[in-house]
Amino acid sequence: MAKLNIADIRQEYTKGGLRESELPGDPLSLFSRWLQEAIDAEVDEPTAVIVGTVSPKGRPSTRTVLLKGLHDGKFIFYTNYESRKGRQLAQNPSISLSFVWHAFERQIHIEGIATKVSPEESDEYFRKRPYKSRIGARISPQSQPIASRMQLIRSFVREAARWIGKEVERPDNWGGYAVTPTRIEFWQGRPNRLHDRFLYTLQPDGEWKISRLAP
């Protein structure tokens, strides 16, 4: 294996700063502003979020999904409940979410608890998905080994034939999670690695405590 010469790859962070005077009391309003700025700037996959879960033995795993909503202070995404993350969340609902927008030199890291959304909410979103995505959700044994890509394609074709002229129904093993945050950190790159980091921590009375963290 060739040696990767990456030790000297670096860049300065000069896109902006984050001041205490700019921080709202509610972190979700700052999250919404940063996300909207990423959307308006047409960055690639602005809603992409790295989801971290933990196995019963404490082994962490991550994957990238798409945020599909922010409702009543909760972050919403959808997945296969029988996937690796679904199985882990069934045993340990603790979860982390990380957003990275390189164009703005910004990151947001969230910790919280995941719960399933209602079947009705999952149905409503599923109906909005493209037809082929709905078929794909029905036939994919997500995270399980399969013999070949051809097997997947054949399953897709057979399933699509079953639903010609009919509304494709959401499978029971597919739906949404709502993440209730307990900690939200905002990271803004700054020159000389003196980055701005602010941590919001949810208090027992429902208020958020704000702390500046060392970079």
Report residues per predicted region.
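Binding-site signature for planar aromatic cofactors or substrates
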Residues: 1-215
